[in-house]
Amino acid sequence: MSAHLQWMVVRNCSSFLIKRNKQTYSTEPNNLKARNSFRYNGLIHRKTVGVEAWPDGKGVVVVMKRRSGQRKPATSYVRTTINKNARATLSSIRHMIRKNKYRPDLRMAAIRRASAILRSQKPVVVKRKRTRPTKSS
């Protein structure tokens, strides 16, 4: 089935839809922006890109759909773990999408999602408040 026909079926009746505050979001896997739109849908396209947090808390996992294994869902996704510093992680995601000519329209969304995940994994430094000496009269 073509992606457009699948979109016409899935767009208003999917178990991943969340309709709140006059907006429609989607919680499906490989949807980079969590928007219910044709471009970012992770179920209907032959090529999809997803970025997830690594379960250990350091690094990200890039999930790409194989073009060849469409009829075998168990083997249709390739998961690549990237556990480097932030700049190297983002550049390797950029190269994975650009050099393989793999959905260039999702490149910036994937980089932004990975950047947000890496930022959330950084430890939070608690700043101590300076105590002012009391004024003596």
UniProtKB/Swiss-Prot annotation:
For the cross-link Glycyl lysine isopeptide (Lys-Gly) (interchain with G-Cter in SUMO2), the position is: K58, K65
Using the record's annotations, give every residue carrying the modification Phosphoserine: S115
Keyword Hydrolase annotated: no
Q: Which domain of life is it from?
A: Eukaryota
Q: Does the keyword Lipid biosynthesis apply?
A: no
* Keyword annotations of the record: Acetylation, Cytoplasm, Isopeptide bond, Phosphoprotein, Ribonucleoprotein, Ribosomal protein, Ubl conjugation
Location within or outside the cell: Cytoplasm
Which Pfam families does UniProt cross-reference here?
A: Ribosomal_L28e
MF terms from GO for this chain are: structural constituent of ribosome
The UniProt entry's GO biological process terms, in alphabetical order, are: translation
**GO CC terms of this entry:** cell body; cytoplasm; cytoplasmic ribonucleoprotein granule; cytosolic large ribosomal subunit; cytosolic ribosome; dendrite; synapse
Name positions with the PTM N-acetylserine: S2
InterPro entries linked = Ribosomal_eL28, Ribosomal_eL28/Mak16
Instruction: Tell me the protein family, please.
Output: Belongs to the eukaryotic ribosomal protein eL28 family.
What this chain does, per the record?
A: Component of the large ribosomal subunit. The ribosome is a large ribonucleoprotein complex responsible for the synthesis of proteins in the cell.
Q: How does it assemble?
A: Component of the large ribosomal subunit.
- PANTHER family recorded: 60S RIBOSOMAL PROTEIN L28 (PTHR10544)
- Identify this protein by name: Large ribosomal subunit protein eL28
